[in-house]
Amino acid sequence: MGDDIYIPPKPKPKPKPKPEYKYALWYFKYTNTYEKRFNGTVGDLLNRGFNYAIALEKDEGSGTPESGNLREDGEKDGKEFGEFINSELSGIKYIAQIPYYKRGMLEKLKNASKDKKQMEYYINHIYLVKRTLEYWKGWIDGVIESCDSNLVGFYWNFESPGQVSWGFITDWEIAQLSTYIKQKSNELNRKLEFIWIPYINDIENPDNNDIKRLSKYFDYVFVQPHYYIAWKYWCLWNYEKNVSEDIREYWKYQINRYNGYLTQGITKLIEVLNWIKEIPNGYIEMEVDNKIDEYKYHDLINKACDYIKAREFLTGRDIWQIRAYYFDTNIENVDKVRNGAYGIKGCKNW
């Protein structure tokens, strides 16, 4: 026994890290023609590790052309949009928006927001607000017709977390869209994703919305935590005094809405991320915007990095493995968060 030589067991190989998939929000606008708002190129996205571009308009369809309510109208408009993104996004896989609002409608709703009767009128006559299901099906057909195989899905361009409960659309309509996209996938013999990026509206009662309820209709639901946004509103409230009372009231409303982030910081963010984890196909949207360039707002880079810091405290399913990115329209914002800027260290894994 004394002559036995101990041979230690071979160390277990380290598990290979799971691949990560990153979706970049790629904004466009429409005046008399489609134009990209993003300030970079497809190469800029690929070089920063983005696998997909989500082509969307910031006003949830309100700024997107609309020929009418019929299926053929949607097909015509979808084809024009598809031709645009197929050209602009050549070289990267992309997701095409499905516009919710009728053209110009968002501005009308904003103007009516202080008039309870007017808002009730719109909700009771929701056909004045949204495009039709037949239009959306035609839009999907038109986009598919004019796009190549780099089109890998559709994005439901309506962020409202309570859109069914609040009367903006029915559960049945979302289900119909989901089924139709699956049908088109079968016809094409390739997967078309259906994704949604709602914001969380109540961080104290995160179930106070339709996100979990509607998630079954989507392949991925990227939830906007609004942690970065909450801190931005806090900065605006404290630093920008020379604005209208209406604007300051809006900032104050947002501060109160997300006050838990401001008082508890990353602890509250972790709570919200654990809630997102409860959604089987729920993932995170990373957030930053152009405000980080302004002198008083440089510390917002740290708030963007808190999304990565919080990852260390979560166990179980990794909601960062597949993630969406909002970085305004400026690709350099990604670099500033990852590499640091203005004396702020940054976080390379963002």
From Swiss-Prot:
It comes from the Archaea. This is Uncharacterized protein MJ0957.
